[in-house]
């Protein structure tokens, strides 16, 4: 692999995505036979990326760690610390790249973070290996509409987070304080919601969408129901660890994300 964009972590992951245009189905596939043995990682190769693609990449990197962070059960403090440090690093360096896209050090930090975020390291110890409901929800958006994966994730994540956070409150509170550095005053609910708002504000800094309409698409209610149905089928009926989602939950999240 010769890495030209820091985003999906393909250089160290066992994951891939397959799109079937007949029926507009987009599905993830994981197999260790697909994990590269060798990768060339030169941050200079990412310096010509459009700002939008850089922002999408930074968002995707964050999401790969967020998906593994918000789980119920089996979490390890050392893994949490690695994940939190990685997310803080991505946020800090993404902000640098907004104004200085050819900053070598920032490009290098983001590139290495992308590799570590999706090679399994940030999920070590979690019982189910991650939540990944946001990815499943976005895959249906990306399957039906022409949207960048990172942008789709940013558009759906806030609505997903507000829908599930009460079922995974200690993790959301911890994320808010340790990653987003929000004011810890108030109830756990207050802190968790401030954390969700803080990361949405960060997405806006990157000019990423925080709603489906901001993706430039306007799905009908029938299309929302279709996406929820396809997502449920693709997940064999349910998805998630922070909160297990079923088809009706998925529809409600899509609806809230408009």
Where are these regions (language model features)?
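A glycine/threonine-rich phosphate-anchoring loop and its flanking beta-alpha core
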Residues: 1-78, 174
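Active-site segments that bind and position negatively charged phosphate/pyrophosphate groups
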Residues: 68-198
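C-terminal charged capping/lid subdomain of soluble metabolic enzymes
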Residues: 172, 179-258
């Amino acid at each position: 692999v010769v890495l030209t964009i820091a985003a999906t972590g393909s250089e160290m992951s066992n994951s891939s995505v397959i799109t079937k245009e007949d029926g507009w189905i987009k599905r993830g596939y994981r197999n260790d036979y697909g994990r590269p043995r060798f990768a060339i990682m030169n941050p200079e190769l990412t310096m010509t990326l459009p700002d939008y693609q850089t922002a999408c990449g930074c968002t995707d990197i964050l999401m790969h760690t967020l998906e593994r962070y918000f789980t119920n059960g089996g979490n390890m403090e050392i893994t949490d610390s690695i994940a939190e440090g990685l997310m803080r690093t991505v946020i800090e360096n993404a902000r640098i790249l907004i104004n200085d896209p050819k900053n070598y050090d920032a490009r290098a930090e983001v590139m290495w973070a992308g590799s570590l975020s999706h090679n399994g390291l940030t999920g070590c110890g979690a019982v189910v290996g991650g939540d990944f409901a946001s990815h499943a929800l976005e895959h249906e958006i990306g399957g039906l509409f022409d949207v960048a994966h990172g942008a789709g994730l940013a558009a759906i994540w806030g609505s997903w987070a507000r829908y599930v956070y009460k079922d995974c409150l200690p993790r959301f509170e911890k994320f808010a304080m340790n990653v987003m550095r929000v004011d810890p005053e108030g109830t756990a609910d207050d802190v968790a919601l401030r954390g969700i708002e803080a990361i949405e504000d960060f997405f806006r800094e990157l000019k990423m969408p925080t709603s489906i309409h901001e993706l430039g698409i306007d799905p009908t209610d029938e299309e929302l129901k279709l996406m929820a149905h396809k997502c449920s089928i693709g997940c064999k009926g349910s998805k998630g660890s922070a909160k297990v989602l079923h088809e009706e939950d998925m529809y409600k999240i899509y609806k809230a994300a408009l």
